[in-house]
Amino acid sequence: MADSHGDTGATMPEAAAQEASVFSMTDVVLFSLIVGLITYWFLFRKKKEEVPEFTKIQAPTSSSVKESSFVEKMKKTGRNIVVFYGSQTGTAEEFANRLSKDAHRYGMRGMAADPEEYDLADLSSLPEINNALAVFCMATYGEGDPTDNAQDFYDWLQETDVDLSGVKYAVFGLGNKTYEHFNAMGKYVDQRLEQLGAQRIFELGMGDDDANLEEDFITWREQFWPAVCEHFGVEATGEESSIRQYELVLHTDIDVAKVYQGEMGRLKSYENQKPPFDAKNPFLATVTTNRKLNQGTERHLMHLELDISDSKIRYESGDHVAVYPANDSALVNQLGEILGADLDVVMSLNNLDEESNKKHPFPCPTSYRTALTYYLDITNPPRTNVLYELAQYAADPAEQEQLRKMASSSGEGKELYLSWVVEARRHILAILQDYPSLRPPIDHLCELLPRLQARYYSIASSSKVHPNSVHICAVAVEYETKAGRLNKGVATSWLRAKEPAGENGGRALVPMFVRKSQFRLPFKATTPVIMVGPGTGVAPFIGFIQERAWLRQQGKEVGETLLYYGCRRAAEDYLYREELAGFQKDGTLSQLNVAFSREQAQKVYVQHLLRRDKEHLWRLIHEGGAHIYVCGDARNMARDVQNTFYDIVAELGAMEHAQAVDYVKKLMTKGRYSLDVWS
């Protein structure tokens, strides 16, 4: 009460003073408003008088916009063969380019095309072009999935009922027999086009990357073109010849700000990073941790942590992180030296076909050093078409003959290529060293070499626990070839050398992006999970376990969590040993089962432990609705594990083998048996 009395107890002189103060303030405010309004009126009226009369903006002409009709482009440029490619690592694109280049030998003109850049509904108009043919080089990614650039095409094929009568086509698929869904994309495209009324003019080709993909392609190609000639009534105009696709332009006086320094897409994108980040716009992540995981000296297994703060990159447990590596500077320098080239010359390789969407084989202008370091694959054995093109530069007739033989489709040539190049793992530098007379111009070599591709790793962390970092688990690849050379993995050697930020005053940066995966924990946290991941195959399960531990901390009920892990010896390469022991101790891991393959006389693998626990596993699968996850080697481990589950289901489910196989296949269809494997 005293406070309220105090509020009204002012004397008359004080009240008068307050009133005068209020009136003077009101005057000031009113005066300011009037002045402001007058000023605004004069200023903005004047500006409005200067605005030109509005005129309708003309729409850009069809030639200035991105062409979505590949048929119109074919008509405009006189092409009658289009080769579409679904490519994740660049191989399918390379094959498509080779096929489109072949066409000129038969009096035809071809073009390679990315289905992501065109409206594939235009296929129905293809018969408007005389002797038109659509070829599809389709790679299968992961577990029967389309590649990123073919996803829209795949979706369209599933949804459309367009009539493709009169469309002539052929398909070559790229796959790997160690995977469950071998060449699924190639098979689907081939079958679906026929269902829509298109006419297959040559049988489906299926390349196997687990064997010899290059030989599979050559064998299919040498039978494909005679079938095309017979169907369209044309003849080959001559032998395969060397035709340059790009012309060299040297930049002797160019602003360095206009020169690419390793960026994958937009110039200066590494200096001015803008989301969203993807394959064409990777994020430069700082390496904050790079530690060796194992105790042994025979191999180097490592754990890296990449800082993705402020990138707006989101990921989930089970996703993949892709990194763009750089070639070893020593190899690059040796290439420059053996070719007698100045690697710091700035140049551009410009497509001679002005109508092509692909203006350069890699970002240009750039230096030879940058191209060989960041853009070109210099460590994988070159394909036969590269050897064929290089042969013309061999001064020694014997060396030229050998190169042409290896590039041929003869049985002897294929065998020589397989043994001398593929099995001996000879990269381009090794070939130049072994053939002293072979010295191609560096610009032509840069045109011929394939692009250096991103490397994918299963993310070894959970975004619930580590929202601002992505973790990688990898083994440094290093081996001696049959020729006695020491070869090193491009990406793992590069990652191994990345020192965490702050250790030497600088930042170790990794261009990266995240690729979504179907390898996901069950929607219901109470669903049991059975994880099988020997070696670095444990990576995604570290993320899974972290996430389940986080859920438990949030008070959620979590189902049984079983891990079957395998390594050689406990003291040598037991990855994440302390972390896994901690998860077992706190109850997140219901079971931690470790198979040591070299700890005892008789080797023990993860499938042996699965057989040991068959009753419990069957109960979890059949009654508990458990989800099974397998990560690691596709060639042996994944197949053996799958066969083990067939046996468990057959025995404890009282089924015939065929019934057990069908049971497991249905688990896969329902998303209860997931694979994240590689070969």
Swiss-Prot record:
Enzyme Commission numbers on file: 1.6.2.4
Gene: POR
Binding-site residues, FAD: R425, R455, Y456, Y457, S458, C473, A474, V475, Y479, G489, V490, A491, T492, W678
Residues exposed to the Cytoplasmic side: 43-679
Transmembrane segments: 22-42
Class of the enzyme per the UniProt entry, highest EC level: oxidoreductase
Gene Ontology annotations of biological process type: response to hormone
Membrane topology reported for the UniProt record: Single-pass membrane protein
GO molecular function: flavin adenine dinucleotide binding; FMN binding; NADP binding; NADPH-hemoprotein reductase activity
The protein's required cofactors: FAD; FMN
Stretches of the chain found on the membrane's Lumenal side: 1-21
One CC-aspect GO term: cytosol
Organism: Oryctolagus cuniculus (Rabbit)
Free-text function comment from the UniProt entry: This enzyme is required for electron transfer from NADP to cytochrome P450 in microsomes. It can also provide electron transfer to heme oxygenase and cytochrome B5.
Residues that hold NADP(+) according to the record: R299, T536, S597, R598, K603, V604, Y605, V606, Q607, D640
Positions contributing to FMN binding: 87-92, 139-142, 174-183, 209
Endpoints of the signal sequence: none
Protein name per Swiss-Prot or TrEMBL: NADPH--cytochrome P450 reductase
